[in-house]
Amino acid sequence: MATPISEGAEGYLERFSVGNYRHLLTGIPGYPQIENAALAVLACDALGVSEEAIRKGLAAAKNPARFEILREHPTVIYDGGHNENGIRSLVTSLSRYFPGEKKSVIFACMADKEIDVSLSLLAEGTDAFFFTEVKDNPRALSAEDLAAKAETLGIRGTVCKTVGEAYEAALAADRLTVICGSLYLYRDLTDYLNKTKTK
């Protein structure tokens, strides 16, 4: 596969070139999306898809819960990264778009996930961890067990039984907040945000 060449960021989207295509723009935020978009472009090119359609397709591409900006001032990002590779991608994007900025992390995960490396990667530049849990999922690791696991790695945080509680606590700190560790948590968070909008 031809290697994509980064041409810089536009907000949280990335400009890139690949093959015979120049100045393409990803539709999904996050630096690692360049590789995904480049693969899609080359596949479309091989199938004879027009350049105009390729550009429109990239612009229209959306993937909720993947470096999704939920709000600004302070910025809140949801990323469904739930394994080492996903968390590495998240950390890469954070260092690109928010260099040196301190953050709060809201984290939940499934009990069968290996999280030592993920938590260690997230710990750098994190001022506060909020450990929560996914509702109504028998595979979910409890917030208390998650906090205990993190403590064995030298990472301390606040235990929050719901993502709503964690969200409000993190928001009170008025800094970049990242929510990650499980795609299942996205449903709980959007349910909470939708309920608070209607109050």
Cite the ranges covered by each PLM segment.
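Nucleotide phosphate-binding/pyrophosphate-handling subdomain across enzymes
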Residues: 20-128
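Active-site catalytic pocket residues across diverse enzymes, especially alpha/beta-hydrolases
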Residues: 47, 94, 150, 193-197
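A glycine-rich beta-strand to alpha-helix segment
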Residues: 165-194
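C-terminal helical cap/extension that packs against the catalytic core
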Residues: 10-15, 75-76, 119-176
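ER/Golgi luminal nucleotide-sugar-dependent glycosyltransferases, focusing on the catalytic module
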Residues: 144, 190-199
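Extended acidic/charged loop-beta regions that coordinate divalent cations
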Residues: 1-23
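Short glycine-/acidic-enriched loop or helix-start segments at secondary-structure transitions
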Residues: 87-88, 115-117, 140-141, 188-191
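Cofactor-binding loop segments of dinucleotide-utilizing enzymes, especially the Rossmann-like FAD-
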Residues: 107-111, 133-134, 181
